[in-house]
Amino acid sequence: MRLHLRACFLLLILSLASLPLEARVVRVEIASRTDVLNGKLFGNTGAYERITGRVYFSLPIANVHNQQIVDLDNAVNLKDGEVEFSSDFIAVRPKDAHKGNGSMLLEVPNRGRGRIIGLVDGGDWDLANDAGDAWLLRNGFTIVSLGWQWDAAGPGALRFFAPIAKENGKTITGLLRGDLMLSKEMLEIPLGHFILGDIGGSEYPVAAPDDPRNVLTVRDARDSARTLIARKEWQFAHTVDGKLTPGDRFIHLNGGFLPGMIYEYVYVVADPVVAGGGLAAIRDFASYAKHAADAITPAERVYAEGISQNGRFLRDFLYEGFNADEEGRMALDGVLAHVAGAGRGSFNFRFAQPSRDAQPTSSVFFPTDIFPFTDLPEKDPVSGQTAGLLDRATAEKVVPKIFFSNTSYEYWGRACALISISADGKQDASISDNVRIYHFTGLQHFSGPFPPAKGKADLEGQEPQSPLPIKYFWRAMIANMDAWVRSNTSPPPSAYPKIADATLVPLADYGFPAIPGVNKPHEASRGDRLDFGPNWQEGILSIEPPKVGEPFPVFVPQVDSDGNERDGVRSPEISVPLATYASWNLRDPSIGAPDQRVSFEVSYLPFAKTASDRQRSGDPRRSIAERYSRREDYFTRYTNAVDDLVKQRWILPEDRLAFLHRGEQEWEEATK
């Protein structure tokens, strides 16, 4: 974004002295402060406390490090050259800060929900009754979740509170677009972007319901032609107590919305929120924790963690130059951006839609998978532009240590290959010494249940989901990041598929075996060259839907004869397999569009138990009995695979037994 301003920004950075300002946290309001689990002691760290509240920031508009925030100078609460924002926060910290390890895990919450403690430690995300095995707490980390999304929806969501913008006191209007594919018939849909119920972003209400620029279209796939739905057939309305009532946050369609179709709406909105301040909030809280003598969460080192939407947020944070605080100091020492694929997002635009992602059948053609994709500079052969994610951080000498980690899903669902190849698709791209790229084979966007089961509702696929857990890889990544920043101990080298050894191939060369009854996708997600109007690279989108230019190359990981990926961090389930973990899952016919991929999921396709079973079904993959002479043979190989992961520091020694237990469970499930 804002590529043609990039050179000017870098010149400003290099020519201006740092302004004599502190990290701009101006006050902290505490809503609650309680001992975790009634003062339970966690290893040598001792007791922890959980603090909730709101933190307030003030951003000087003249500071060069704030000038990339869209509409900051138009904020209605601009006073004395500064704009105030605030964020909800949750902090879990050692009661005695001196007993902590000095490192903070700063969680960028996904749509307002902070869940990293539950994911890594296995207990309650809010530590209400159960801390799991308390790995983070036993190891002395401070964990903070900080609101950054202005429209985070649903109860308990951590919010970012930002002013609206006006130009010279006048209301700003514009066009906003949304889309979705339903899994069941509905008479009306909400405006906004919602995932799994009320999780998502509320976005903007319609400002002018009768404006002729408001349009509704339908099509059957991403690249299909749109069909305009006559204006008399729909209205901005909502059913209340059985009565259809005008409403500025719903669309009602006569005859109803059908499943398996992409409905896209464009409508007039007003009063944009200065959403880009959320990027500065993460920056300034990190610097506050490291430099303020009275910080409520003191830290020597800060590692930002983001999953999916918030992983994309961190990629955008780096690209837009937010890792230098207002004094030019490094804000984040480490970044762990997980399952972000090649994406960034709608985080710093006028009328920003931060919840929007880029799924197979929704949030299509949004400013998500947009150039540049690689950390080091790359050239777009079509536009001639040259840029990389780390250009600004490099110019300011604030490049953090970075893990870009992804699963099998992101190569098909998030255009992940673009982070490691040239924009023309001819070769692998070089990566920074401060970057590691990790591809966790066989895993999906979020871990599925065990025993394996199909997704439900909007996520019902044709096959069971991948049940492989990410938890233990997360623990090792956090430990490796801490060692890298703290003592310069190099983490495991990058592990991902490459063009050079044909483990990353064009979609047409993908060699998945012909498994009876298993349908394969005909396409994969891609990065597109989009044009939202003459000022969109300054954050103002005026053409909706955008003009779509030539797509970037589509590459996917190559597979072996079983259909499992050949390169990356290979789970024991991949190197000693009992099943195929296909990198995609198609929508179940019951929810419509069965030729399209379902969001987030990988397919679990078990092997036949015996050779005769395999031969009867026509399955080309060897059966379990043909691979392993008995249970002990399998478990010996599985144990060796686990030990290899421990040796390479992909998992921690203390998690070895948990992996071995899982291997036993998987054998029982596969052979029952």
Residue ranges, per PLM feature:
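Bacterial N-terminal signal peptides
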Residues: 7-18
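Sec/Tat signal peptide C-region and signal peptidase I cleavage site
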Residues: 19-23
